[in-house]
UniProtKB/Swiss-Prot annotation:
Name the UniProt record assigns to this protein: Tripartite terminase subunit 3
GO CC aspect terms: host cell nucleus
Root EC class: hydrolase
Family matches, as Pfam families: DNA_pack_C (PF02499)
Keyword DNA-binding found: yes
Entries under InterPro entries matching the protein: DNA_pack_C, DNA_pack_C_sf, HSV_TRM3
EC number: 3.1.-.-
Compartments (UniProt record): Host nucleus
BP GO terms, sorted: chromosome organization
Family: Belongs to the herpesviridae TRM3 protein family.
Spans traversing the lipid bilayer: none
Length: 506
């Protein structure tokens, strides 16, 4: 290859191939076709596309507003962008690749598995190995609310099977999932639910904001990932009808939860409280109040029962890089007020920050919260510890909590204890985000009413859903359930440890 070609490969983090006939052929074709006026050709592993000419090849979608050249060498793609170009890339290598062993290629582009929600970025490269399960769709869809978002999905050889790949269904799509921002007011939400090709308010037809860039074909593309993903993850609305759904909470238990609220700041209950306060933070990086928000719950034990002491449902004002700090500040106020209402009671405050959506942001929330609570911690003399998770194959523990299979056990435990009257709310329940407009207990009960169990194939395959009908989000419910679980019997995989600044202390 020429020196300029080698420099271009290194610029994008790829090792220049040595004596690779495919790579040489692609490079030659790229040089030859770059001067064409309206190119649209496929040669071996090279694909060139002209402006506004979407093309489909090997389940790949590359719509561009400007020039984009894709050259494959080994198992990787070199993507050369011109100004103002963007694309949604799904790529599958043509098996077999016999030259891969003789001509290995390395890449620093597709190297990040953690999420970046809540942070400002331009490009996101996702390997299919990180999202072949439908549960990861909720994380991917969260990126679509950011206006300067470009997603690159690099698929593996599993792309050809729908059972192992979410991207297989995208072969019939005509749009890219880029720059997707939508606005739907409460008055027109039912209309969007009923009409499958509507993505924004009808009242914005004449004066459409510049940030509304979605059309019905993009909504269809989103639905190809997971059914009802547009309404659930972007618009915040309905959930598809289930074949088998059962109510799991007795009305008698909900009435008891609303009526009986013991005082936890007065004698004798204050002396019988556990010395451990457990907080669970379920962060959501979205400003759409019809979709998911951040759920925060604080619980402790009182004579064998779980008592809810604090509850927050927090929404960001805007999608900025300060999302982690704002969520930490909300949690800080809730924990601080709870401790001040029960001075000298708690000897340890345990905090679990869920990291399923974004491990980077969860770590930032934990570190920021530790800094904010440091003065109060010194004044009241309690220890502040955070739930840690150890990555597979690593001895390093990080200050976030990954929610996996224990979610079903947590809901089973919550339902059992709630129906038996062992889940209560304190009269001194702290809430800075819910109390202004609603009774926090009634707010939580409304979410509990939506809780259903969906059984697909026997009791072994059951899924709990709290978004029935799209009436309310289930963020507070999930936070309360997980806080009660961690307080009663659950423990993080790597235990609880203190954090200080940017260094986790074991």
């Amino acid at each position: 290859m020429h020196r300029s070609d080698s420099t271009m490969w290194l610029k994008y983090g790829l090792s220049p191939p040595t004596r690779s006939p495919n790579a040489a052929l692609c490079a030659a074709a790229a040089t030859k076709c770059a001067s064409m006026t309206r190119p649209s050709c496929v040669l071996d592993s090279l694909t060139l596309y002209s402006p506004a000419w979407p093309c489909l090849c090997r389940y790949a979608i590359f719509p561009c507003r400007a020039w984009a050249i894709y050259v494959r060498a080994g198992n990787f793609i070199l993507t050369k962008f011109s100004r103002f170009s963007f694309c949604f890339c799904v790529w599958s290598p043509r098996p077999p690749i016999a030259a891969a062993a003789n001509h290995p290629a390395t890449s620093t582009i597709v190297a990040r598995s953690q999420g970046l929600r809540g942070q400002d970025f331009n490009f996101l490269f996702v390997d299919e190995a990180n999202f072949i399960k439908p549960g990861a769709m909720h994380t991917i869809m969260g990126f679509l609310n950011q206006t300067n978002c470009k997603l690159f999905f690099v698929s593996s050889t599993n792309t050809g099977q729908s059972s192992t790949s979410l991207l297989y269904n995208l072969k019939g799509s005509s749009n890219s999932l880029l720059n997707v921002v939508t606005y739907i007011c409460d008055d027109h939400l039912p209309e969007v639910q009923q009409r499958q090709n509507v993505t924004t308010c009808s009242c914005y037809v004449l004066q459409k904001p510049v940030y509304v860039t979605m059309d019905h074909s993009v909504r269809n593309t989103a639905e190809l990932f997971v059914k009802d993903s547009f309404m659930n993850e972007i618009a915040g609305g309905q959930v598809g009808n289930t074949l088998s759904a059962r109510s799991v909470i007795a009305s008698r238990a909900m009435d008891q939860f609303l009526v009986y609220r013991p005082s936890t700041s007065n004698s004798p209950n204050v002396h019988n409280l556990s010395r451990v306060l457990t907080a669970y933070i379920d962060p959501a990086f979205t400003a759409n109040r019809s979709a998911s928000g951040t759920g925060i719950a604080l619980v402790t034990e009182l004579n064998g029962a779980t008592v809810l002491l604090g509850m927050e449902h927090f929404y960001l004002e805007a999608l900025t890089g300060e999302a982690a700090a704002e969520i930490a500040q909300c949690a800080n106020l809730c924990v601080a007020y709870t401790c001040l209402l029960h001075p000298g009671v708690f000897r340890e405050v345990r905090v679990a920050v869920e990291g399923n959506s974004s491990q980077d942001s969860a770590t930032a929330i934990a570190l920021r919260l530790a800094d904010l609570l440091a003065p109060l911690q010194k004044r009241l003399g309690f220890s502040l510890v955070f739930a840690h998770t150890r990555q597979h194959g690593s001895s390093v523990a990080h200050p976030f909590y990954l929610l996996n299979k224990q979610k079903s056990r947590a809901f089973d435990l919550f339902i059992s204890r709630f129906n038996s009257g062992n889940i209560m709310a304190s009269q001194e329940l702290v809430s800075n985000t819910v109390l202004l407009g609603n009774d926090p207990c009634e707010y939580l009960v409304e979410q509990i009413k939506n809780l259903e169990i969906v059984i697909t194939s026997g009791d072994a395959n059951r899924v709990y859903s709290g978004k029935q009908g799209g009436k309310l989000a289930d963020d507070v419910l999930v936070a309360v359930v997980m806080a009660a679980y961690l307080s009663f019997e659950g423990a993080p995989p790597a235990g609880y440890h203190t954090v200080s600044g940017a260094v986790c202390r074991r």
